[in-house]
């Protein structure tokens, strides 16, 4: 490994090891980043399901994305301190096929989703769970787990030979814990790795029988094409441009079929915007330049801007992160 990458590795490891294991275990799994309602995490699970059952569950996938939009809109209302009565008024308006209540405009994607569901449905539950006098309590877990239950039931009797899967920068099993909870994990021979030993200890405590390792994305200790597919989230923005290119080369080297990549800080511009923050980076990446890098190694690179995707598919213009992207890479 080049000396500059060794130094960057040390800085990255130090930046994460400064945090406690409890904080790391809860990182990126709450609020709008909760993988049950985060669109990038949902699309990643759909990517995995399509690897083993291509096209089989398209309608369910569409409804799960709609579910995420409904819950995220509800979270926005709760942040604005709506009351339990106001939430019930929203449900009454939906039942009466109205698009506003007491001056609160109900987005069309909410109305369309409600109309597509039989009664009673999860929207009825979501907008009646809170006590009349307050909405301070969090949304109930059983409601957030709506599609976890759906997928577990749908996949329960499915069979498939395990597909080898790699996740660099796995954190404290941030996404894997939901891949497992949704009944998807058993179709994959999974390996997750991270630079931060505390993350790996957290992951192993949750999943003692799974393969979680301390490894370095700049030098992956695996043969060429060792894994059928790979997914990785929120990694490349934190690397220097040179290190990022090395990491991409390594991930592509060890992956045989397809890669799903989530970005949190990307834009439709010509050049990367490099921003060093303390001992690591918080870069704004160019979608076009990143696509070109992956096309050096792959047969096809699909770029999905989450904001544009949700607007064109569902008419939703209320995403929380305009810089969120997903790349689907076919090797």
Could you say what each language-model-derived stretch is?
Residues 231:
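A conserved beta-strand element that flanks and buttresses the S-adenosyl-L-methionine
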Residues 234-238:
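Short catalytic micro-motifs in class I SAM-dependent methyltransferases
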Residues 2-221, 239-246, 260-331:
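Class I (Rossmann-like) S-adenosyl-L-methionine-dependent methyltransferase catalytic domain
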Residues 245-257:
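A short glycine-rich, Lys/Arg-flanked "PGG" loop and its adjoining helix->strand segment in the class I
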Residues 163, 228, 257:
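Conserved acidic residues
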């Amino acid at each position: 490994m080049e000396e500059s990458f060794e130094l960057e590795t040390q800085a990255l490891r130090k930046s994460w090891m400064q945090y406690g294991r409890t904080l790391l275990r809860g990182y990126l799994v709450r609020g709008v980043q909760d993988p049950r309602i985060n669109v990038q995490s949902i699309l990643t699970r759909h990517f995995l399901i399509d690897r083993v059952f291509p096209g089989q569950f398209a309608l369910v996938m569409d409804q799960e994305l709609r579910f995420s939009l409904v819950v995220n809109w509800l979270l926005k209302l709760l942040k604005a301190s709506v009351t339990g009565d106001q939430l019930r008024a929203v449900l009454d308006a939906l039942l009466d096929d109205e698009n506003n209540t007491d001056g609160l405009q109900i987005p069309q994607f909410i109305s369309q989703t409600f109309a597509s569901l039989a009664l009673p449905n999860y929207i009825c539950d979501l907008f009646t769970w809170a006590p009349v006098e307050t909405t301070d309590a969090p949304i109930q877990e059983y409601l957030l787990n709506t599609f976890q239950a759906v997928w577990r039931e749908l996949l329960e009797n499915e069979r498939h030979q395990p597909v080898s899967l790699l996740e660099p920068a796995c954190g404290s099993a941030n996404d894997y814990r939901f891949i497992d909870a949704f009944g998807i994990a058993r179709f994959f021979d999974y390996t997750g790795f991270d630079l931060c030993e505390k993350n790996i200890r957290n992951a192993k405590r949750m999943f003692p029988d799974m393969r979680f390792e301390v490894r370095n994305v700049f030098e992956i200790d695996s043969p060429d094409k060792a894994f059928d597919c790979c997914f990785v989230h929120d990694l490349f923005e934190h690397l220097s441009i040179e290190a990022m290119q090395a990491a991409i080369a390594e991930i592509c080297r060890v992956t045989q079929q397809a890669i799903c990549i989530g970005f949190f800080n990307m834009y439709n511009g010509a050049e990367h915007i490099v921003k060093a923050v303390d001992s690591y980076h918080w870069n704004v990446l160019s979608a076009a330049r990143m696509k070109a890098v992956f096309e050096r190694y792959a047969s096809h690179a699909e770029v999905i801007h989450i904001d544009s995707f949700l607007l064109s598919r569902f008419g939703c213009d209320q995403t929380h992160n305009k810089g969120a992207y997903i790349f689907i890479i076919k090797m």
